[in-house]
């Protein structure tokens, strides 16, 4: 039992900085929304529309690069640190290629925005302007993620946290300058948020690169000291590992976007209640998401050391800690749901609906925690293809259709409205949690030679 407590301490030591980094990232989005809203409601709406297109695109690239973390962790655990620099260099090449693809998509996002039903022309113009400013930050963001994944693969999660807060602190004054036009800069309104955020991503990358080059613990890993051409074999391996993660993230983000669209015709009260519950549950999701990143590092490191038993200890401890955190957040949600809803809105009908939906959110928090930590475990085992199939099946084959039937039809029960979609979330996330755990057990029961051979690829 002692080894599980020791492992839990190590996991939390890795996870807490990741949690704080996520908080900083979320706060940046909050600052953009508030400061754009202070300029005008139209600019705030433009930032919201632009962000809804930016997030799926950039998270696809982010997911692709997550493959680097278990690769670096495994090489570090096996004592092959001399090979890490080559993997990271190829990670930068991959980030560059994906950045170009994302920038092309975002530059042409005007076609998506203009096709929206009854959208105001001025709003559409501002949303396109915001995206065309923000897209120049895509390379900076993805390069930052490569450097961050290198650090996290080496069990250094604090640098990502520090750079996240540097980005947040820089974002506020730069937003002010470009939104309102100070110090000789043009007054851009909501578009200025895009300029500021793009600039901040490059600042975060430059700061992280400076830290990596200065850190004593990484002096033997010199990624920038020699140029290396794209290595097709390494790039293909990173894509093979990262593409299923990227697609899983994309399907998860688009699921919630589709549900938001399906809820929108139900009326202002339903939309507001749904959005409040979704926003709060997203904040709670930061805890298991960060723990999943820590579990990936620990499992990858243990497999690199050649110890499948210790990898199992890391995996089981991660699930146990995740369930404990989820029970705590679920109890907090149940007890404080009305007070939480009142922080967002004081309309009694909205508060009542949001409180009811948060009760359903509390139910699925345990499943959500298990499934996301299970995904982190499978990343550590480099079994990323399963993540894609499980996520797609749970969300799009089971969760969304069942939610649609419960929310908008009378086929099973009388129409439940937004609560039906949240029941669908419970079905989807619980299914994902069960399948993730079954897959984990299947992998762990394989002979050690097969597990270590897969991890070493």
Swiss-Prot record:
The keyword Repeat does not apply. GO terms for cellular component: plasma membrane. It holds the Pfam family MatE. Keywords: Antiport, Cell inner membrane, Cell membrane, Ion transport, Membrane, Sodium, Sodium transport, Transmembrane, Transmembrane helix, Transport. Its main location: membrane. GO terms for biological process: sodium ion transport; xenobiotic transmembrane transport. The keyword Transferase does not apply. It is a multi-pass membrane protein. The chain crosses the membrane at residues 11-31, 53-73, 93-113, 127-147, 160-180, 191-211, 243-263, 276-296, 316-336, 350-370, 387-407, 418-438. It is found in: Cell inner membrane. It comes from the Bacteria. InterPro entries: MATE_fam, MATE_MdtK, MdtK-like, Multidrug-R_MdtK. GO terms for molecular function: antiporter activity; xenobiotic transmembrane transporter activity. Belongs to the multi antimicrobial extrusion (MATE) (TC 2.A.66.1) family. MdtK subfamily. Multidrug efflux pump that functions probably as a Na(+)/drug antiporter. NCBIfam families: matE. This is Multidrug resistance protein MdtK. The gene is mdtK.
